[in-house]
Amino acid sequence: MKKTLILILCLFLCTVSFARKRVKVACVGNSITYGIGVSDPDKESYPARLQQMLGEGYTVERFGKPGATLLNKGHRPFMQQKEFKDALAFAGDVVVIHLGVNDTDPRDWPNYRDFFIADYRALIDSFRVANPECRILIARLTPIADRHPRFESGTRDWHDEIQLAIETIAKYAQVQLIDFHAPLYPYPFMLPDAVHPDKEGAAVLAKTVYEGITGDFGGLQMPEIYTDNMVLQHGRLLTIQGKADAGEKVTVSIDRQQLQAVTGADGKWAVDVRPLKAGGPYTLTVSTEKRKQVYENVLAGEVWLCSGQSNMEFYLNWSATAAQDVPQAANSNIRFYDMKARWRTDAVEWDASVLDSLNHLQYYKDTQWTVCS
């Protein structure tokens, strides 16, 4: 009986200990954090999606106040709202802050911009008092689309100024900067009212925060233009770059050069390769501890970018002198990366699936470098 009681007590203590290890994440912000723009904020807001992505080891709570400003002299200061008090009481281990969009209001930024950095620092310090061990991430602002009624009457320029202020705050307050702007900017359809992300946009924000918290960017990834048979520009310093998990060491090898980089908190890395001599073939190897990508038959030479109208699609075998010209095209020292359009711009109606693909910037078919023949 005594042994049974001891065993039950041990199991209870282990359960309590495990429960205490859950990482608390406080998502602090305005209506975008609250979930205005999605039909069910409890399930579709970015904090709700973040909870799904992080899993059982985390507890994510949202403290979003629609209309809230970062500025304490703004029209609805976040630090005067109940959501701020609730966020302090939550004492998150991780605090994600996205504030400043509403400060583009003409009542706020033009009059009180000089207080923005100090007010943001005060907000950060408040969370550090609530939990001295907390980790803080602050976000660059989500885009405001040109459909916004005040876009050209100051909002666009004030939005840009606030972005710069946020970058300054991240540097001097020593907090992690994440980017809510770049992932959404190419997709204005995800901002139906020009400000609030829809369900898909909220998922994009959740992924951005997930990557920022965990450092998981999906491992080593190279741009699509890197394939076998590619051509690298010769005779000049060459930057090779890609993505990997935060903190991962990346090794790049080519032509007896071996260079290393450590991936930043934003998942990006880059190395500068000393000028390559024209010729080859070379082998380009990019690797981390978990993954390796090898590109064979790589040449160093002149890289030309050719772009234009429909005449750029003209095939050599369509020419009047095709019989003489085509046999001369075979040259293993010439490589071709041909980006063909998925859909032609003829006078035909596209269906909804095509429009959806174009909205997602899926303009071109998958391709790779080929040896000219």
Indicate where each model-derived feature is located:
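C-terminal catalytic domains of large/alpha subunits in multi-subunit enzymes
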Residues: 327-343, 348-361
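Alpha-helical cap/lid subdomain in secreted, periplasmic
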Residues: 1, 20-21, 52, 56, ...
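Extended acidic/polar, glycine-enriched regions
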Residues: 241-321
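Proline/serine/threonine-rich low-complexity linkers at boundaries of modular beta-sandwich domains
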Residues: 217-222
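Structural beta-strand segments of beta-rich domains
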Residues: 228, 236-240
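Bacterial Sec-dependent N-terminal signal peptides
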Residues: 1-21
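Conserved SGNH/GDSL esterase-like catalytic core that processes O-acyl groups on lipids
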Residues: 22-27, 32-121, 276, 297, ...
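A conserved hydrophobic secondary-structure block that centers on an alpha-helix together
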Residues: 357-373
